[in-house]
Design a protein with these regions (language model features):
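Residues forming the flavin
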Residues: 1-173
Length: 173
């Protein structure tokens, strides 16, 4: 870091999720879009001077109560949403800034420069949790979250062992 307040910040969504080609995680973590919006809005509020905030996404998943209102407020407050997956990030030696390359919705190659890039990393179960589930005899889904019945979400395949929190699947607090 150069200890300077950035003038432009980019958030890259779905890092490590919704991607069976690179990481094998096909599921949506379901919280990252809203976290990125909140962080971008707070960053703009606390910035000294203008701050350009951009959220690069495959699509925005705002499916909770009033989340769509929050999304619309973010747009109104100047958060820019770009529907694309950034395919490369390079350091610009002359400034230390980051150059992002992506293909826009029209199919054109775009290059933009940012002072800070935030990776919105998908939620996943740790190796230790997978090992513990194995020792306890708790079956897991292919996503490695607890395999439970949608109508009995805390029950697991092992009687007396219950799932809670993100062991059930990605979720907001």
């Amino acid at each position: 870091s150069d200890d300077q307040e950035p003038k432009r910040i980019a958030w890259l969504q779905c890092i490590g999720s919704r991607d069976t080609n690179q990481c094998g995680n096909s599921y949506c973590s379901s919280v990252c879009c809203m976290y990125a919006m909140k962080d971008a809005m707070i960053a703009k509020e606390h910035a000294h001077g203008g701050l350009d905030c951009t959220i690069f996404n495959m699509d925005i998943r705002s499916f909770g109560k009033d989340y769509e209102k929050y999304y619309n407020r973010a747009i109104k407050d100047g958060i820019r949403f770009v529907r694309s997956r950034v395919h490369s990030v390079d350091v610009l030696p002359e400034t230390g800034n980051l150059s992002l390359r992506y293909v826009d919705e029209a199919g054109g190659l775009q290059v933009e420069e940012y002072g800070l890039v935030v990776l919105s990393v998908g939620l996943q179960i740790s190796k230790d949790t997978v090992d513990l589930a194995g020792r306890l005899g708790v079956e897991l889904k292919p996503s490695r979250f607890a395999d439970s019945n949608v109508f009995k979400p805390v029950e697991t395949s092992r009687a007396g062992v219950f799932a809670c929190g993100v062991f059930q699947g990605p979720k907001d607090i």
